[in-house]
Design a protein with these regions (language model features):
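Upstream accessory/linker segments immediately N-terminal to the RecA-like ATPase cores of bacterial MutS
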Residues: 1-66
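Conserved pre-motif I regulatory segment
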Residues: 49-97
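Conserved motor-coupling elements within RecA-like helicase/translocase cores
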Residues: 156-177, 184-189
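Conserved SF1/SF2 helicase motif Ia
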Residues: 93, 107-136, 144-149
Length: 189
């Protein structure tokens, strides 16, 4: 099954058999990418590509301070490690693992806020439109007082709205893009 067919059938299966095939295809892709990434990391090959130096901004510190809860020790450790990587100017490859509700998203919010305040655009890609919409709502709420422009881009976004969003991204009018695989289409510049 082709990748685009698998994406379609995972959301709108024509039959139970199509759903199973789509699920197997997407699981295979996920494991293949994971294994390839792990091989790159463990092979000791540094990426030759230069990254951007992005430091911790006062807004990120303020956001953490104003959360209605304290970050866990594991979250603080992961955040500090990733912030150090971002400040190094090297390309960062990280996998943040955790159960549902363990606090992975808040780390993404903080790191993407740092990117935006440093003058860069950032993207959060979610596996489903429902999750992308949830992230869009939570990011918008958490970052409302930081003058961050956030866009939602999914497969079901209407064509006119997509064109407008593509243009805003290209023109630098969007700081953070949240979406599904639609965010990695050729039209996104």
């Amino acid at each position: 099954m082709e990748y685009h067919q698998a994406i379609w059938n995972i959301h709108f299966p024509e039959s139970k058999e199509q759903l199973i095939k789509a699920k197997k295809r997407l699981i295979f892709d996920e494991f293949f990418i994971f294994i390839a990434a792990m091989h790159m990391i463990t092979s000791g090959e540094d990426l030759k590509e230069e990254g951007y130096k992005i430091g911790v901004c006062k807004e990120a510190k303020e956001l953490v301070k104003n959360l209605p809860y304290e970050l866990t020790t594991a979250q603080k450790r992961a955040l500090n490690e990733m912030a150090k990587d971002m400040a190094s100017g090297k390309v960062m490859n990280r996998l943040v693992q955790g159960d549902v509700g363990s606090g992975k998203t808040i780390l993404a919010v903080i790191l993407l806020l740092m990117c935006a305040k440093a003058g860069y655009q950032g993207v959060l890609m979610a596996p489903t439109e429902v999750l992308a919409a949830q992230h869009y709502e939570s990011f918008t709420e958490l970052l409302e007082s930081y003058d961050i422009k956030i866009a939602l881009l999914t497969g079901s976004t209407k064509a006119k709205e997509k064109r407008e969003t593509y243009q805003k991204i290209k023109d630098g009018e969007v700081d953070i893009v949240i979406g599904t695989h639609a965010v990695i289409q050729d039209k996104v510049e």
